[in-house]
Amino acid sequence: MQNQKFIKVIKNNDTATYINIDHVAMFYVGKDEETTIVNFKNGEKMSIKEQVDCFADRISM
């Protein structure tokens, strides 16, 4: 097992999703302050309109 850094995204129905921080170039709050914009290293963008817990630790199997 190896310790990796993830961004933890809490969805409105209290389920969580994890994005591997190694794939993320940067992220920032959007204009409406409820949206988080994630820029990936491969050039893709993702807009998250949910609560984001940045740099959450998670053990990856």
Segments from the language model and where they lie:
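Acidic, Ser/Thr- and proline-rich intrinsically disordered linker/docking segments
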Residues: M1-Y18, H23-M61
